[in-house]
């Protein structure tokens, strides 16, 4: 049984930490910016709640983190009372935040100075994947640190793959988000067209999903998109943040992402419609308002 710390108990982190406790039987100490949520988690799963990231990370073998963005990540690691102030030699810090490859490299170097490991380990599978413990985890960092942390990561994962050196996990997640953005825009236009053409939508989806157009987004989102229900899953605000990271990285590495840039702007329109917290398949809403 390992001693594990968890920082960030949002819609993803809360159940992910729960799986480590329930499936792995590990000793957990959790920290959340809203202390009441950490207390709630501790009561539900039988762990401990810490007042600061530093307190949570003290003496831990593994420290997991799932927060909002690069700045949040820096705050809970190298900021005042950050986890790195108590990160012990030989520990491994596993970051499940979708963040930039640059911040991953920065924190990997900072952890190394402490004699600790750092893995950038963003996830795919959304809230449902987190709740069911079947996330896909793409991981960058040293191979030895990955092997050490892999059994704990598997508590909430369907697949955990070492992609290469530090930053490779975040870069792979960017590929994931680029692909999803294009798929959702295409599905939005297809459904919008089918509605305008007067087609039987369920029959049309049942037919084309057996062919080359099939995708996870089609199978899991067509019905809620058609019914205008977007109160679940991954929010527009977060998707736009992720696409911004992709576009920043593309400016550095020279990749051309014309469709991604366009969809990122479409998400800004959804935000202006008041849809920042809508699920990211709500791209279809802007077509209905044109």
Region spans (language model):
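Rossmann-fold NAD(P) dinucleotide-binding segment
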Residues: 53-116
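NAD(P)+-binding Rossmann beta1-loop-alpha1 motif at the extreme N-terminus of oxidoreductases
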Residues: 1-65, 91, 96-97, 127
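Hydrophobic beta-strand scaffold residues
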Residues: 28, 49, 117-119, 160, ...
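Rossmann-fold dinucleotide-binding core
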Residues: 67, 98-178
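Methionine-biased hydrophobic packing positions in alpha-helices, especially
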Residues: 12, 16, 66, 96, ...
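Helical "substrate-binding/catalytic lid" subdomain
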Residues: 167-290
């Amino acid at each position: 049984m390992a001693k594990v710390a968890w920082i960030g108990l949002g819609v993803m982190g809360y159940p992910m930490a729960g799986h480590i406790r329930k499936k792995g039987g590990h000793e957990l100490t959790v920290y959340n910016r809203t202390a009441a949520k950490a207390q709630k988690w501790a009561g539900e799963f039988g762990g401990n709640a810490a007042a600061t990231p530093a307190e949570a990370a003290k003496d831990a073998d593994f420290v997991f983190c799932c927060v909002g963005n690069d700045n949040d990540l820096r705050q809970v690691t190298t900021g005042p009372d950050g986890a790195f102030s108590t990160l012990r030699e030989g520990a491994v810090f596993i970051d499940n935040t979708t963040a930039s490859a640059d911040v991953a490299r920065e924190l990997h170097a900072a952890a190394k100075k402490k004699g600790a490991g750092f893995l950038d380990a963003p996830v795919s599978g959304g809230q449902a994947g987190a709740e069911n413990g079947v996330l896909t985890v793409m991981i960058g960092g040293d191979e030895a640190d990955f092997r050490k942390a892999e059994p704990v990561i598997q508590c909430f994962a369907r697949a955990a793959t070492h992609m290469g050196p530090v930053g490779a996990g975040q870069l792979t997640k960017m590929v994931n988000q680029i692909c999803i953005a294009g798929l959702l825009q295409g599905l939005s236009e297809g459904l919008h067209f089918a509605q305008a053409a007067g087609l039987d939508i369920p029959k049309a989806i049942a037919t084309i999903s057996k062919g080359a157009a099939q995708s996870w987004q089609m199978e899991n989102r067509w019905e809620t998109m058609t019914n205008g229900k977007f109160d679940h899953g991954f929010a527009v605000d977060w998707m736009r943040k992720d696409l911004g990271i992709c576009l920043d990285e593309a400016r550095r590495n020279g990749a051309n992402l014309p469709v991604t840039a366009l969809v990122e702007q479409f998400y800004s329109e959804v935000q202006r419609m008041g849809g920042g917290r809508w699920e990211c398949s709500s791209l279809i809403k802007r077509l209905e308002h044109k």
